Design a protein with these regions (language model features):
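Conserved beta-strand position repeated across blades of beta-propeller domains
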Residues: 179-181, 225, 288, 350
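Hydrophobic beta-strand positions that form the internal "hydrophobic ladder"
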Residues: 187-188, 230-233, 293-296, 358
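Low-complexity, Pro/Ser/Thr- and charge-rich linker/hinge segments at domain boundaries
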Residues: 37-38, 115-144, 217
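Residue-level detector of Asp-centered blade-edge/turn motifs that repeat once per structural unit
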Residues: 182-184, 228-229, 291-292, 353-354
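Contiguous beta-strand segments within globular domains
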Residues: 39-60
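Multi-bladed beta-propeller domains
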Residues: 30-40, 73-90, 157-173, 203-220, ...
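Short, conserved, GDST-rich strand-edge loop motifs in beta-rich repeat architectures
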Residues: 132-145, 235-257, 298-315, 361-373
Length: 373
């Protein structure tokens, strides 16, 4: 028995020597230098309840030590593989200590010269926390491997991930465009393509499938946005195509041959639109209600001969008044960004919950900016 206890003590001592966050001597003669870290967290601002911001050096053969310093915490993480995994408990304590301030990060590393180098930067920590769940669609990268996909949620203060819906249960059909009403996890929608095709509205334990028709013919809905009241949902209806270039650096081209915006009345189970949102002379898409519910922001481009003139398509950012009591729109459209004048194209507009900030993507042309370098 004594022998066994001795082995346990020796093993425990060895583990303590490798323990991240334990005292680690820092190189005294490190020279200031740049290094590309992934992900790049330099000077970012994060919510106080975010999970550890683990990162790595560009070469897994690089040795390094990372120091995280706040007023009351001093964490040191050694690595022989270029990967820095920050202990959960120590990160939480450091983030709590740095609320409204910053964590000073010092990354010591050895490059090809085998000399110690040093990169310093701050990570700012907000006094505020964010919603506890992040929801996203997970699919293989590329443009063909869509047979396995799902909508997942991850707890932001750790790395626990759970499926909301996985397409293994639906015959490997496409699921996409999930959207929540005012970040309410119990009230959401998502689209299902092919098998069991349609748009599904989830309200607590109730699930309804909706199908919008035009002159008796069902058509698919795409980009959604809830009205803050929960009574309406704005959708785009897109005839989307995908082509491939032989020599262009943007190898894949995704474009709309037509698109309009329709509004679905949740309580009355009906869809409606107006000419300013569904003109055959324009491509209307990416609707987004403002937080007060009194305006709809959307993108619109002049229709052209597609796909031949795809590079001529540039989307304006527009706004139209909306009366949620009557369910009616205004008679004119305001231009927030004139694509014809600016020479760029707008997509995916979003208004901050307080209504003070507007976020959107800008690209040289088109509306599928993720493929445009």
């Amino acid at each position: 028995m004594k022998r066994t206890k001795g082995y346990k003590i020796i093993l425990l001592s060895g583990l303590l020597l490798l323990c991240p966050g334990c005292s680690e001597d820092l190189p005294a003669d490190a020279e200031i230098a740049e290094v590309a870290l992934f992900p790049d967290y330099e000077e970012v601002t994060v919510p106080a309840n975010i999970a550890p911001l683990n990162f790595k050096l560009p070469n897994e053969q690089m040795r390094g030590i990372t120091r995280l310093k706040t007023i009351h915490k001093d964490i040191r993480i050694p690595s022989r593989s270029g990967v820095f995994n920050i202990p959960m408990d120590e990160w939480k304590e450091a983030a709590e200590d740095a609320k409204g301030d910053k964590i000073d990060v010092s990354v010591y590393f050895k490059d090809s010269s085998n000399a110690w180098k040093l990169k310093r930067f701050p990570i700012f920590v907000s006094e505020d926390s964010m919603d506890n769940y992040l929801t996203y669609r997970r699919i293989f990268p590329g443009y063909r491997m869509w047979g396995e996909m799902g909508i997942y949620q991850r707890t932001v203060d750790n790395f626990v991930e759970n499926p909301v819906i996985n397409n293994r249960r639906t015959g490997n059909s496409c699921v996409n465009c999930h959207s929540f009403c005012r970040q309410d996890g119990s009230k959401m929608l998502f689209h299902q393509r092919s098998n069991y095709g349609g748009t599904y509205l989830v309200d607590g334990s109730d699930v309804d499938k909706i199908s919008v028709t035009d002159q008796g013919k069902a058509f698919g809905l795409a980009y959604p946005y809830w009205h803050p009241s929960g009574k309406y949902i704005a959708f785009s209806h897109n005839d989307t195509r995908q082509d491939f270039h032989y020599s262009d650096r943007n190898r894949i081209e995704v474009y709309d041959k037509s698109s309009d915006i329709v509004i679905y009345h949740v309580e009355e189970h009906r869809a409606f639109t107006v000419p300013l949102l569904s003109s055959p002379a324009s491509y209307e898409t990416f609707p987004a209600f403002t937080p007060d519910g009194k305006s709809l922001i959307f993108c619109s481009a002049d229709s052209v001969n597609m796909p031949d003139e795809y590079r001529k398509v540039r989307y304006h950012l527009l706004r139209i008044a909306f009366d949620p009591e009557k369910g009616t729109f205004g008679q004119q459209v305001d231009t927030l960004y004139n694509a014809r004048k600016e020479g760029r194209s707008i997509s995916f507009p979003r208004v901050s919950p307080d209504g003070k900030r507007l976020l959107y993507a800008v690209s040289d042309y088109g509306n599928f900016s993720i493929w445009h370098r």
